Curated annotation (Swiss-Prot):
Active site: 70, 129 (proton acceptor)
Source organism of this protein record: Streptococcus thermophilus (strain ATCC BAA-250 / LMG 18311)
Name used for this protein in its record: N-acetyldiaminopimelate deacetylase
MF annotations from Gene Ontology: N-acetyldiaminopimelate deacetylase activity
Catalytic activity from the UniProt record: N-acetyl-(2S,6S)-2,6-diaminopimelate + H2O = (2S,6S)-2,6-diaminopimelate + acetate
EC number: 3.5.1.47
Family matches, as InterPro entries: AcetylDAP_deacetylase (IPR023905), Amidohydrolase (IPR017439), Bact_exopeptidase_dim_dom (IPR036264), Peptidase_M20 (IPR002933), Peptidase_M20_dimer (IPR011650)
Keyword presence, Transmembrane helix: no
Source species taxonomy: Bacteria, Bacillati, Bacillota, Bacilli, Lactobacillales
UniProt keyword terms in alphabetical order: Amino-acid biosynthesis, Diaminopimelate biosynthesis, Hydrolase, Lysine biosynthesis
SUPFAM superfamilies for the chain: Bacterial exopeptidase dimerisation domain (SSF55031), Zn-dependent exopeptidases (SSF53187)
GO biological process: diaminopimelate biosynthetic process; lysine biosynthetic process via diaminopimelate
Pathway stated in the Swiss-Prot or TrEMBL entry: Amino-acid biosynthesis; L-lysine biosynthesis via DAP pathway; LL-2,6-diaminopimelate from (S)-tetrahydrodipicolinate (acetylase route): step 3/3
Function: Catalyzes the conversion of N-acetyl-diaminopimelate to diaminopimelate and acetate.
């Protein structure tokens, strides 16, 4: 069948939902998938919570090729002014997952035209933004015997043009780790500081000391980010704060570096707390947001394939410090992630982010050729 990619994308754009709450999105996808797979006896399907797995049995399979897309939206008030803007208040597809899903449906439609030689898995994964849905599915056994031998996926990129595909042979996205540190002192009157134990001051010392992690503990060639964007302490001007809470993020290009920085954050927090004679709670939550590390051999193959296509402008790009939970699945299955240019002036997660829809036909055409090649390889 011939899919109306623009209509599908606009339909999906109007119903963004937060991770593990993608009920309308799942229902819409299941309807389209049912239409496409009718009469195709080589297709099986499973659901996992709000996720969907579509498996194409190959005619003479030697391996399983996987394509993964994410399906969730963000808690953002849309400001695009589009006729097809979000109908869910306070929710928006500001990270391009509507483009991702539409592309995946288009690719699935192409692969259904003729039974492939190799098996193929199309994964519509929930909760990329908030709960590391890929990790949840893997740990819950959702893949079963459908786990791919190779996994591929994309992410849209606003500052690249339509026709651009960008990746590299190592790390594409950073791993991320949430940090929440709470210092617990003793409150009191501002006039009697000697009778209190000021958690605000302790947290301030902590914030300044963690700045030395990147400058003195991290190899300058490897790099790393430690940022605290939230600091909450106290209630008014003349009361010494009993507790202080700081909330931040760690981003690194290797898991080894992430573990080093996490260790140093914990050591500094405990050291500062001890020096002030107070307690400290430390929460380090990485979950499934590991670095997105491409398999070098598969990345070279993919890059050579796209480089040979006149329609593709292949870019060998540097890593980005953005996070993506596909990193977890790529830690279990070799594969490749790449950027797809969508040519819009607004960044990902911006309330006015609006992709150039010409990217859809390009993506389905060019990536479809690659998947057909892999399906017959």
């Amino acid at each position: 069948m011939t899919l109306d990619l623009i209509k599908i994308r606009r339909d999906l754009h109007q119903i963004p939902e937060i991770g593990l709450e993608e009920f309308k999105t799942q229902a819409y996808l299941l309807e389209r998938i049912a239409e496409m797979t009718e009469g195709k006896d080589f297709v099986e399907q499973r659901t996992w919570r709000t996720g969907i797995l579509v498996f194409l049995h190959g005619s003479a399979p030697e391996k399983t090729i996987g394509w993964r897309t994410d399906i969730d939206g963000l808690p953002i008030v849309e400001e695009t002014g589009l006729d097809f803007k979000s109908i869910h208040e306070g929710r928006m597809h500001a990270c391009g997952h509507d483009i991702h899903m539409t592309t995946a449906l288009g690719l699935l439609d192409q692969m259904l035209q003729v039974q492939p030689k190799n098996n193929m898995l199309f994964l519509f994964q929930p909760a990329e933004e908030n709960e590391a849905g890929g990790m949840l599915m893997y740990e819950d056994g959702a893949f079963g015997d459908w786990l791919p031998d190779e996994f591929y996926g994309l992410h849209v990129r606003p500052d690249f043009k339509v026709g651009d595909i960008a990746t590299n042979t190592n790390t594409l996205f950073a791993g991320t780790c949430e940090v929440l540190v709470t210092f617990k002192g003793k409150g009191g009157h501002a006039a009697f500081p000697h009778e209190a134990n000021d958690a605000l001051v302790a947290a301030s010392y902590f914030i300044t000391q963690v700045q030395t992690i990147v400058s003195r503990n991290v190899d300058p060639i490897q790099g790393g980010v430690v940022t605290f964007g939230s600091f909450h302490a106290g209630t008014t001007n003349n009361v010494i704060a009993e507790t202080a809470e700081v909330y931040g993020t760690i981003r690194t290009l290797t898991q080894e570096m992430s573990l080093l920085i996490q260790k140093r954050v914990r050591q500094i927090a405990e050291g500062v707390a001890a020096s002030f004679g107070m307690e400290v709670d430390i929460m380090l939550k990485q979950g499934g947001y590991l670095p997105v590390e491409n398999n070098p051999a598969l990345a070279k193959e993919l890059m050579a394939f796209f480089d040979a296509s006149p329609a593709v402008n292949l870019i060998d790009c540097l890593p980005a410090m953005t996070g993506e939970d596909f990193g977890y699945l790529l830690s279990k299955v070799p594969g490749v992630m790449f950027w797809l240019g969508i040519d819009t002036p607004y960044a990902l997660h911006h309330p006015k982010m609006s992709p150039n829809e010409e990217a859809l036909a390009f993506a389905v055409s060019e990536i479809g050729k690659f998947l057909k090649y892999k399906a017959e390889d």
